[in-house]
Amino acid sequence: MSYRQLGFIFFLILPFFVSAQTSTQLSASEIKLGLKKLNTLGSALYIAAHPDDENTRLLAFLAKDKNFRTGYLSLTRGDGGQNLIGNEQSELLGLIRTQELLAARRMDGAEQFFSRAVDFGFSKTSDETFRIWDKEQILADAVWVIRKFKPDLIITRFPEDSRAGHGQHAASAIIAREAFIAAANPKRFPEQLKYVQTWQAKRIVWNTYNFGSLNTTSESQMKLDVGKFNPLLGKSYGEIAAESRTNHKSQGFGSAKQRGQAFEYFIHTEGDEAKTDIFEGINTKWNRLVEGEKIENMLKEAELNFTVDNPAMSVPALVNIYKALSSLPDTYWKAQKMLELKEIIAAAAGLWFESYTLQPIQTLGDSIHLRSEIVLQSSVPVKLIRVNKQILNIELKEGIAKTILSSIQANEISEPYWLVNNHPQGMFDIKDQLLVGYPEKRSTALIDFIISIGGQEISYQRPAEYKFTDQVRGEIYQPLIVAPAITASIADKAYVFPGNTPKTIQVLLKSFRDKSSGTLIPKIP
């Protein structure tokens, strides 16, 4: 069976192995936190080797206290790890651990990235690791993520030497340092520059650790208290970190919540050396953008006047900020803040919209019948201009849900993009450069909602999902799955042929349509 078939078949049952999602809407305190984040133009990227290597406490602090755009680049998907919740190994385990990382990021507020490296199991040294990994290709992937994400600060979990305790750990630190340098060099991986620009991060540091038997921390190192309490969330970052880390269920990483002071320690690796604070010299103000100061002042005023009892009162000011931001020259930070701002506007206005199907599996080439629902939960005047190609021009009324029926074509099979092609031991084979780094391929079943609010048209996209109500768990959302019309698999994993004696092989066919017919022609090797 090919990796592509393996990935697709498991994709059908993956929802049973990961935590089902429920859709949520931002609370007033989360909207206020979002306003603070809007006024912070800083970013940090954490780099390590595997799922569960990341420091969730530091990620939560960076994302929710410093309000940085925060990411974690795991070079592998953890294919070579243990599995305490099932029998899945190798690529199937990598699928599970990918979902565990995404669940963890939903808790701590960071974003998730991967390279094409395969976790092939334990290795003693980085040299041994690079005999199996294609170092140059993985370096290119890390450079690609850095050039797209544009971090001001890069942080590694491990050192480059034997203290890392694992060859892949040490290799991740080497890749991170070399990528920090190469990302700024236009002569390195120039083929990427038709999509992205070079990027020079301010510095790269090593986040040292005390793992009990191995303590690499010292009071002479830069340190940062990440154990603070966030009153807007009602939690400390130690509590958020435990909730995040507990999602690594296949590794048995259920974690106790920690409260109170907690220090992280850092050693300078490359770039502008900081003396006492890893954030030294990083400009997080709007003056990074031409005419950005006016946006900063408008956001400060919006935050000052924000009322938790009635977030909708802030909508006119937020729409004015959106208009002002739209007029600025196109930059990375303009695009990022436009995305953040329009979600804050929708949340403050009490706008809820979604698109879903009642069928768990769709068939390639068929029409997917969707229900799109939108409801306004405030008195803010909002007009629904269109949903996809349906022109509506409807004035939404407070508390009255509007349902729109539509259909889209199921034009692409749901499958993990990194398993489409067969691959060697150490590397996934990914043909499309634009997919590199993503945890999953973005859904092609995206529904456009165009609204008019405060005289400004704003476009939103929501993925079409499968929604159902479970008698025990309640309302559940799962990814919409598109399957081929028919799949075929061999009943047994292996057959023994003694001599030239023929054997009967059972082939299992499954149709994802009500009625299917055809002829099965086996290709004998």
What kind of feature is each model-predicted range?
Residues 7-17:
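Bacterial N-terminal signal peptides
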Residues 367-394, 402-407, 415-418, 445-450, ...:
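Beta-strand-rich binding/interaction modules
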Residues 322-365, 466-500:
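Low-complexity, acidic Ser/Thr/Pro/Gly-rich terminal tails and inter-domain linkers that flank the onset
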Residues 21-148, 170, 177-181:
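Active-site rim/loop-helix segments in enzyme catalytic domains that contact anionic ligands
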Residues 439-513:
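Acidic, serine/threonine- and proline-rich intrinsically disordered appendage/tail regions
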Residues 2-3, 20-44, 125-129, 135-353:
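Metal-dependent de-N-acetylase/amidase catalytic core
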Residues 398-463:
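Eukaryote-biased detector of low-complexity, proline/serine/threonine-rich segments
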